[in-house]
A protein has these predicted regions:
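Sec/Tat signal peptide C-region and signal peptidase I cleavage site
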Residues: 13-19
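Outer-membrane beta-barrel channel domains
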Residues: 22, 41-50, 54-57, 62, ...
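Short N-terminal segments immediately surrounding and downstream of signal-peptide cleavage
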Residues: 19-41
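Predominantly the C-terminal beta-signal and adjacent terminal strand-loop region
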Residues: 463-481
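Short, hydrophobic/proline-enriched secondary-structure or compact coil segments at domain edges
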Residues: 109-111, 291-292, 481
Length: 481
């Protein structure tokens, strides 16, 4: 439950219309629950189905468009709730244009409480670490013309119970910097420096190549082009790898070419974990328009390379998305056993907003990540992870199917009832890569003892009172192996 305490101060003067920067909306904000409900019913057509986060400006435009269309009272309430949720990221509510000489500032805060029966956030693999904790956060933001900046520290004692958190867990008050960035936004280019979660892939799932499974980390992000065609790139330094011969500096680079034509979106991407003792940022990998695979082969740029592809299509009968990830794959002529490693891959597909009756919609998803995904033959220095958590998804060697109904029956409240089934093997990207002698006997998928987990549950969020928000995921698991 979140109680929002909002106080905004603005220094604005009228000015000529121009490109205006906007704050980004974090992926864990309740605004996305209302946005997803509207997208499933044909709204917010201006945003991508494959790249997040969105800016508050993008989401507000989508909410206003939904309010201008004919909808039931429940669907209209979603648009109103989305607009309300965005107030925490809107520094110029009066609609005036800011400039470097007339910036706008925002200061607001949240108080929240979390009740959980599992410390592990992946509820299909829930543990028994129950807790009830509290916390709070503060946002201080500024928008000045084409520049937007924010800092968002949080105090959250749930961190002490999360097995994925790499920080100290013996503190009376736990905290971290959740979001902190400065972003320059122009007509054909965006530059972002700071930390914020990102997701490339079907929006209802974690991205395979770039997802929000890790805690937010500092990075440089650039985007060049238009909404119809653009190149996005991200670069960051990861945690060091300590090996017997020294300390390896590790870096993560990824870039994605996105093309939108009418209701179709397609994307092609590369990811690279580069490493070395004393290594620094590599200009050939910082170049967003370079092709990593060519530098990897032709210029001897060592690293763990992955390739990805995404597709999304909006139709009158629902929105359909998919993602493919390819890791270790031998493409050169190499008859030796050392070059015949098992394939590393991932695949996901979703269907959202499939008409049922009235405002009710169906959804479905399937995702799979192979047993050797995110692992590297070179060892821990090439591991596709940040502080031990996959840069895309948290777990490998699994597949999961989910089916459910998106129910628009309560105003200002989203409800998704679902059934899910997961198969989880013992393949783990923290383990050493198999030796060449082990290749013939290493399963590519579902290694070792396989855990099977069916789950029935429901997830949703709502505005239950002015300034009070409630989100949750309740369900029952049954484990067998």
């Amino acid at each position: 439950m979140t109680a929002a305490l909002i106080a905004a101060a603005s220094m604005l003067t009228p000015g000529a219309a121009r490109a205006q920067a906007s704050l980004y909306v974090p992926l864990d904000d309740i605004a996305y629950q209302f946005a997803d409900a509207l997208i499933a019913r044909g709204e917010l057509r201006g945003v991508s189905l494959l790249e997040r986060p969105y800016t508050a400006q993008q989401m507000a435009a989508g909410a206003d468009s939904a309010l201008s269309h004919t909808h039931s009272a429940v669907i209209r309430s979603y648009a109103i709730a989305l607009r309300t949720a965005l107030q925490r990221y809107t520094v110029n509510a009066a609609g005036a244009t800011t400039s470097p000489d007339a910036p706008a500032f925002l200061l607001n805060g949240d108080l929240f409480s979390t009740a959980a029966t599992s410390g592990e956030k992946e509820l299909m693999l829930a543990d028994t670490n129950s807790s009830v904790t509290g916390g709070g956060g503060v946002r201080l933001a500024m928008v000045a013309g084409n520049i937007a900046a924010i800092m968002h520290p949080v105090m959250d004692n749930q961190l002490n119970h999360d097995p994925d958190f790499a920080g100290r867990q013996d503190r009376v008050i736990a905290g971290r910097m959740q979001d902190a960035y400065v972003s320059g936004q122009w007509t054909y280019a965006t530059v972002f420096v700071g930390r914020m979660a990102r997701n490339w892939g079907p929006s209802s799932l974690q991205g395979l190549q770039l997802g929000s499974a890790p805690y937010t980390y500092d990075h440089i992000y650039t985007q060049i082009g238009t909404d119809r065609i653009h190149m996005s790139a991200l670069a960051t330094r990861l945690d060091d790898a300590f090996e017997p011969d020294g300390v390896y500096a590790r870096y993560f680079y990824t870039h994605r070419l996105s093309v939108r034509w009418r209701d179709l979106e397609v994307g092609a991407s590369e990811g690279m974990i580069a490493y070395g003792i004393g290594r620094s940022y590599d200009p050939s990998l910082l170049n967003p328009l370079n092709i990593y695979a060519l530098s990897w082969r032709n210029e001897h740029v060592s690293g763990n390379l992955t390739l990805g592809g995404t597709m999304a299509l909006r139709t009158a009968f629902g929105n359909y998305s998919s993602e493919l990830l390819i890791g270790n794959r031998q493409i050169d002529s190499c008859p030796q056993l050392t070059c015949q490693e098992p394939a590393s891959y991932g695949f996901s597909a979703t269907a959202e907003g499939v008409p049922l009756f009235g405002d009710q919609r169906l959804f479905a998803s399937y995702s799979r990540l192979s047993g050797l995904a995110y692992r590297a033959k070179e060892g821990s220095m090439g591991e596709y992870a940040s502080l031990g958590i996959g840069l895309g998804q948290e777990f490998s060697d699994y597949d999961e199917v989910k089916l459910g109904a998106d129910l628009a029956i309560v105003p200002f409240t989203t409800i998704r009832a679902y059934g899910a089934y997961r198969r989880q093997g013992q393949g783990d990207y923290h383990l050493p890569f198999p030796t060449p002698e082990e290749y013939p006997t290493t399963p590519g998928f579902l290694q070792g003892v396989v855990e099977r987990v069916p789950r029935r549950g429901g997830t949703g969020g709502g505005m239950i009172a002015p300034g009070v928000r409630l989100t949750g995921d309740l369900g029952v698991n049954h484990w067998t192996n």
